[in-house]
Every structure is written in structure tokens, then in C-alpha cells.
Swiss-Prot record:
PANTHER family: RIBOSOME MATURATION FACTOR RIMM. Pfam families: PRC_RimM, RimM. One of its GO terms (cellular component) is cytoplasm. One of its GO terms (molecular function) is ribosome binding. Residues 1-52 are annotated as: Disordered. Binds ribosomal protein uS19. This is Ribosome maturation factor RimM. It is found in: Cytoplasm.
Length: 231
């Protein structure tokens, strides 16, 4: 299961609830396609302390009054505003005054107003600053098969031989279950792998590593066949 600080999802299928940044299990099986490239500019930040959980990351300034774009990693994106004081990747403590969906963007992209921040210049200074919450402010996973989605972001995905397959850059859910978005070792377009026990048999959160059973053509361009494909 891949929880997002407020409600868990799981490798056993469905979510048990959602409120902020969720934990989730891996579902036993899923008919979801293992491949769906989706380019992203940069991997999410890794918490500077294992006792911190990533909740969001600021982007560029929005308008002239101090608002700023914010990517939320919580199960309910707007629930990030309910966590109170948050620690930043540059050592500060910030609190969100309010958030709203960013027009024309994905549901996890918000427009935020930060307490004490006014004017475009101050908002621009927040670009690429990440927000974290202390782990002890979150509910503990209910079993060994649960993990916070934020703990997976930045983790290495390896095959059974220990060879690096890619790095997890996001844990999206489009309604059919959690997915791992993987970026190949040498960069390039990402691909999606169902977060199920069939595709992700081993979780090692402490080592920030998961073992995956990924198809050989996971990162192949649409329509491209493996070199040994007889067709």
C-alpha cells in the first residue's frame, strides 16, 4: 500500500481513506498497463532527515501578490494546507495560509499563499523549496505492507539481480490503483509500473529501494519492440 499522509492505498487494492499525504499497500494484482511514458523535468527532493516526510514542493511565483505554485504529494492535494507549520528543505519553518487548484493543471498542482510571504520577489525565492512534516505527526503504517508514498519518491527500483532499473519520481493514482513512475538510469521519458505485489514483490523503505519485476521494454517508445522480438 502507498499511503499519502492522510489515508492509505495498498498492494491489496483500494484506499482505506484519504486526507493528506497517504500510505498505501501494494495490490495483489492489477490489470493496469505497466507502461505509460510521461516526461518530467526533475525528480522530487529527498528528505534531509529520515524522520521527515515530503508533503510538497514550491514552483514558480504566480501573479504579483505573493502566491506561488505548489506541487502537493498528499492524498487529497489541498489537505496539505491543514498540516500547520512545515519544515523546509532550506531549514525554515513555513505555514500555508490557503491553497486552491491551479487552473489548467493536474489535481496535485496548487496555487498557494504562504503566511508572511507577500510580493512576487518573495514568492520567487520559494521556487524548488520542499515542504516536510515530522513523521511523528503522521499515523503509523498499519502493517509491514504499508508505506508512505513520499518514502518511495526518490527510491531506487532494482530487478531481482540488484541491477538498477530506474528511480521512483512519483506515485500517481488515476483511479485504478497506485502506480510507480520510474525514470530510467540515464534519464529520458518516464514509465509507469503498477504498485502491486506482482510488479513490486519487495519493499525496503529503510534502504530506499524496491525490487520490481518490470517488462524488458518498460522504457521503450510506443510501438518499439525489443531486439529479440520475433514479430
Amino acid at each position: 500500500m502507498a499511503r499519502r499522509p492522510a489515508g492509505p492505498t495498498s498492494r491489496d487494492g483500494g484506499r482505506r481513506g484519504r486526507t493528506s499525504s497517504a500510505i498505501g499497500k501494494i495490490a495483489p494484482d492489477a490489470a493496469t498497463s505497466p507502461k505509460a511514458p510521461a516526461p518530467r523535468p526533475a525528480p522530487p527532493p529527498v528528505p534531509p532527515d529520515p524522520n521527515l516526510v515530503l508533503l510538497g514542493e514550491f514552483g514558480r511565483a504566480h501573479g504579483l501578490t505573493g502566491e506561488v505554485r505548489l506541487k502537493s504529494y498528499t492524498g487529497d492535494p489541498q489537505a496539505i494546507a491543514g498540516y500547520g507549520a512545515l519544515q523546509t528543505s532550506d531549514g525554515r519553518t513555513l505555514a500555508l495560509a490557503d491553497v486552491r487548484p491551479a487552473p489548467g493543471s493536474s489535481p496535485d498542482m496548487l496555487i498557494a499563499r504562504v503566511k508572511g510571504v507577500s510580493g512576487r520577489s518573495a514568492a520567487e525565492a520559494l521556487n524548488r523549496v520542499a515542504l516536510f512534516v515530522p513523521r511523528d505527526r503522521l499515523a503509523a503504517p498499519e502493517d509491514d505492507d504499508e508505506v508512505y508514498a513520499a518514502d518511495l519518491i526518490g527510491a531506487a527500483a532494482v530487478d531481482e539481480a540488484g541491477t538498477l532499473v530506474g528511480t521512483i519520481v512519483a506515485v500517481p493514482n488515476y483511479g485504478g490503483g497506485d502506480l510507480l513512475e520510474l525514470r530510467p538510469p540515464n534519464g529520458g521519458a518516464t514509465a509507469l509500473l503498477p504498485f502491486t505485489k506482482a510488479f513490486v514483490p519487495v519493499l525496503d523503505v529503510a534502504q530506499r529501494r524496491v525490487t520490481v519485476a518490470a517488462p524488458e521494454d518498460l522504457f521503450a517508445a510506443p510501438g518499439e519492440k525489443p531486439a529479440d522480438d520475433p514479430g
